[in-house]
Amino acid sequence: MLDVIELDFDYHDQPLLQQISFHLPAGGLLHLKGSNGAGKTTLLKLIAGLLNPEKGEILFERRSIKKDLCTYQKQLCFVGHRSGINPYLTLRENCLYDIHFSPGAVGITELCRLFSLEHLIDYPCGLLSSGQKRQVALLRLWMSKAKLWLLDEPLVALDELSLLTIIRKIQEHRAKGGAVLLTSHQDLPLNKADYEEYHL
């Protein structure tokens, strides 16, 4: 599904990423690892088409993402380290913000029950805790029909039950042929044989 080929990226004229290459197949999960400042978030932004590399190529389904960036970006969902939640909109409004990209998506109330948030569905998100805001960002992810999930530290600020919920949803996405690329300082609660790791 996704091929990153000999990617280079400079930050302030200094090399940050060099010769990055990997393949992420449909149904695959790749855990990006590295110390703070290693370029994990930058690499996700490059793959999302938000930054341009100095060298190298990114292919999605064997086609350069540069060929039709807009169409490519409709097939991915990027949840950054920050939640990206509008504090002035309600939980429901935040989740439905991009609903035109995902016709036929599962109902918002049903998804809210996964995190026991249904009683907060019409609360402004500015009143939610950091963990709850993170959960709302993940609900938006699950409402999308994106094939490729790019997740930057998705396990941050989640309790154990929420962590197990997101792992289950990731596995369900993979079982349907989707692919997941994530960063995390935490070890994933999965068998090591069930996913790949890439160290920056």
Curated annotation (Swiss-Prot):
ATP binds at G34, S35, N36, G37, A38, G39, K40, T41. GO terms for cellular component: plasma membrane. PROSITE patterns: ABC_TRANSPORTER_2, CCMA. One of its GO terms (molecular function) is ATP binding. One of its GO terms (biological process) is cytochrome complex assembly. Its main location: membrane. Part of the ABC transporter complex CcmAB involved in the biogenesis of c-type cytochromes; once thought to export heme, this seems not to be the case, but its exact role is uncertain. Responsible for energy coupling to the transport system. Belongs to the ABC transporter superfamily. CcmA exporter (TC 3.A.1.107) family. This is Cytochrome c biogenesis ATP-binding export protein CcmA.
